[in-house]
Amino acid sequence: MDSFLRLLIHGASGRMGQALLRLASEDPSFQVAAAVVGQAPDRHVSDGVPFFAAAELAAVPAFDVAIDFSLPQGFSSLLALCVARAVPLVSGTTGLDSRQHEALVMAGAQIPLVWGSNFSVGMAVLVNLVERAGDALSGWDCDIVESHHVHKQDAPSGSALTLGEAVACKGIAPRYTSLRAGDIVGDHLVQFTGLGERIELVHRATNRDVFARGALYVARRVVGRVPGCYRVRDLIM
């Protein structure tokens, strides 16, 4: 039996994909079976890793788990491939539409999968703290401010929406503010405001590696689990 997991990286040309390629190559518990990029790759093999264009997805070799940080346009094809091959999927692709989220839930009846807007340990803790604050602060105002680099397309960020869901389930309607500036990796502020006082909970990511390490950790943990839709914090905390 192999001592490593064969990993498919989907969205390998993006910032997260590049971090995953680098960190997975340094981790003896993984072997990158294939890397998928949007357009035809410049080189079909790089550092021993075979690269495939998104249109060639069906041709990728066997893999034990897929990690996806891509765009919504390519997500559905990967989900279908993982279901067809009965392989777990870990996805951090944000901006999915309602039909894609429904497809995720349906796929969870057949394979173990994790969709998350943020794979850092700190964000998992922040979501937990926000839920607990929501329990204690009913009637307070809640504002969520997220800041990211200028190239991030979706707003509010997926992480901001996850934080918003954590307070919305407590009966609090959050307001969102999105900032796009410079090369900010990811800042999230959750502010609860009452009469004469306020509480601020903040998470700042200064290096994209925290998300990639978290995704690799979750990928190791989800392999071998029964089919279902798992939360990041189910596997990190």
Swiss-Prot record:
Pathway terms, separated by semicolons: Amino-acid biosynthesis; L-lysine biosynthesis via DAP pathway; (S)-tetrahydrodipicolinate from L-aspartate: step 4/4
Localization in the cell: Cytoplasm
Name of protein: 4-hydroxy-tetrahydrodipicolinate reductase
GO MF terms held by the record: 4-hydroxy-tetrahydrodipicolinate reductase; NAD binding; NADP binding; oxidoreductase activity, acting on CH or CH2 groups, NAD or NADP as acceptor
Catalytic activity: (S)-2,3,4,5-tetrahydrodipicolinate + NAD(+) + H2O = (2S,4S)-4-hydroxy-2,3,4,5-tetrahydrodipicolinate + NADH + H(+); (S)-2,3,4,5-tetrahydrodipicolinate + NADP(+) + H2O = (2S,4S)-4-hydroxy-2,3,4,5-tetrahydrodipicolinate + NADPH + H(+)
InterPro entries: DapB_C, DapB_N, DapB_N_CS, DHDPR_bac, NAD(P)-bd_dom_sf
Binding of (S)-2,3,4,5-tetrahydrodipicolinate, residues: 149, 158-159
Residue stretches in coiled coil: none
GO biological process: diaminopimelate biosynthetic process; lysine biosynthetic process via diaminopimelate
Binding residue positions for NAD(+): 11-16, 92-94, 116-119
Species whose genome carries this gene: Xylella fastidiosa (strain 9a5c)
UniProt-listed NCBIfam families: dapB (TIGR00036)
Active site, UniProt feature: 148, 152
PROSITE patterns, alphabetized: DAPB
Broadest EC class assigned to this enzyme: oxidoreductase
Function of the protein: Catalyzes the conversion of 4-hydroxy-tetrahydrodipicolinate (HTPA) to tetrahydrodipicolinate.
Family per similarity comment: Belongs to the DapB family.
GO CC terms of this entry: cytosol
Assigned EC number: 1.17.1.8
Keywords: Amino-acid biosynthesis, Cytoplasm, Diaminopimelate biosynthesis, Lysine biosynthesis, NAD, NADP, Oxidoreductase
